[in-house]
């Protein structure tokens, strides 16, 4: 039996595009002699559809699309994922399902049993878990078809009380196929491989795993679909961060063969290399799928905006990126030069708009209220908000999307101005710690200098007052980021972090700042997720909570 794995980029709710893309790949697979072509979880509607799933018309559109797809499957079988109504009288209204289509008709329906309800996953909000498990017979082979999390329930770390494959294995399947929607975070590919490898070896069956590729708002899907033999050996993996249609032959006794050169990686890419690829895909798809093509950002001469600008140019093209220099009376000459050098290196569009006259006019207007009170954060934030007003005016006039340039360290401790430098359409590096931003800059410069060296080595500064440095207000980033990661990503308490050797006062101050800044994060743009625990939909904290204040 010849199996084709179709690793594709879908668009949530875009039934016309998704259906056409699926049918196009069915036709390609048929031309190449495939018996079965496999698509990803909820491919028909895109993942995650979120509250679109609460509209009955949305579910009807899924079924209409499935029927269009089925009409193309007279001489080839396919597996597609879609939400369908739960016809049982009890439980949620929907099932997260897979259709096995053969000879133009739905031959079998498989419903997902294990519904993730953690971090960015919220499937139990919409779907009823299945309690029935049956294999599918096709071309003399018996297929154990599962959906994503149904294979994620490992013996070592069980998340659920059931394990669908324990039931399916009793039906003597010849092969496992798992359709998935597994988003990217650094190191997640290694976890994914380990879990699937364990399943293939435990059940002594070859395993075909197909994933989404592409970005849906903040979630980035890295592809990297996998094929294992029945001993649990990883024998092939599809490319990361790009589409692929790849063919395999399933022989007797679980043998799997293929004719293409193996794309199996000899060694895993570094976290920073993966983050770089993920952010490029995240930017590109956010713009393409939202119907925009051009980006704008404020360019300060610092490392954060430099990295975001370089990523935007690589993702969208220099002709589609506008960098705006917005110097104030506190901006240093070297920062302006660093920004100009970056623009020259990238070849993107640029404008310079001085904000000194505007901020002074605002300060003069407020003088009757401010009187002779000393300069403080109020005047600092006027500068940041003035820049935001100008950038958003450019967006409205010329049709740009504003790129937010705040990093995760700043977002964590609230080192940013609401309605100022925290505004934007998408936050590019809001899930990238400051120390990782430095690494990302070095990675971008791996072949030649794109980001000026001075932007990388000079002390970070917001330049909102004379001689200002980030370290005046925050611990050094190489210490702060480790404390932040412990609290945010590993959910460690202050006591646990202090026991690791970090200064007690620093730890308590950092955690206090994180919790005090929660209200700011509720008002930030969507953040491209690259870590296991990003701010946004996967981290839900109360604004007025007192715990750990």
Predicted regions and their residues:
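ATP/NTP-dependent adenylation/nucleotidyl-transfer catalytic domains that generate, transfer
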Residues: 204, 230, 256-301, 305-549
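Enzyme catalytic cores with a strong preference for nitrogen-chemistry domains
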Residues: 1-298, 309-318, 325, 350
